Amino acid sequence: SVKDPIWKYRWVEAHEPENFKKIYKWLDIKEYLILRASGEFVMTQDSAFGTLLYDTRKGHEGWCKPVCDMVGVKMEHLAPIKKSTEKVGEVTESAAKELGLAPGTAVYGGGGDASLIGVGAGATEVGDTHIYSGTSGWVGTVVEKQTVDTGAMIAAIVGADPDTFNYFAELETSNKCVGWVKDHLALDEIGVFLKKYGNAADSLEQTEFNLYDYLEEVIDTVPAGSNGVVFTPWLH
């Protein structure tokens, strides 16, 4: 999980001190892949923001030393920050052989899912809104200023465009909840399901697929309001 990176860093420091002593730079997964491809140690703005150590104030963008000092993160472990749209290096000879790419192919900073899903959905201009539903889910709107609504637990985060923010109302478990319902509730109806689908459920893979189909059919028969049933799906 990308959550709570600071405390994972501190955990390694406390429980694996010998490994901690060997640290050169602290990278996210995407940045590690950039390193493997190009040999460059960098971190994009959205990844830096995800560490909670990035100063987003205009004119102050960069690692925030006071916060790093407060939580015990060493500044020398933090990589230079780059824009998502910035060329950060080129594919090395060794990486080119592994990847089947031409040596010297440009490597860009890129972005994480929260940054690039909006781009893929076409939500790139101020006011554009998109809805995403995967394992997690959110409603996101491109805004000009960083905004926080502590009452509604909604905040604007750094995205792929360095000049705007993504105002996110996020749910940790969206379609993951559908999987939970399938595993914990729908299997109680397996007799009904098998009777209906018969040999179509011979393999586990088909059972997984067809159970979702069966769920959708059942859901289609439920009236608006679900007869008063409320599901609050903040699952772990």
Predicted regions and their residues:
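A short glycine-threonine-serine/GTX helix/turn-capping micro-motif
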Residues: 1-3, 52-54, 162-174
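Gly/Ser/Thr-rich active-site cleft segment
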Residues: 1-111, 232-235
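Conserved ATP-utilizing enzyme core subdomain
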Residues: 38-39, 43, 199-236
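ATP-dependent carbohydrate kinase catalytic cores
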Residues: 56-162, 172-173, 185, 189, ...
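Extended catalytic-interface subdomain
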Residues: 29-30, 174-177, 182
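Active-site catalytic microenvironments for nucleophilic, acid-base chemistry
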Residues: 15, 36, 40, 122, ...
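Catalytic-loop motifs flanking and including active-site residues across diverse enzymes
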Residues: 4, 8, 115, 173-177
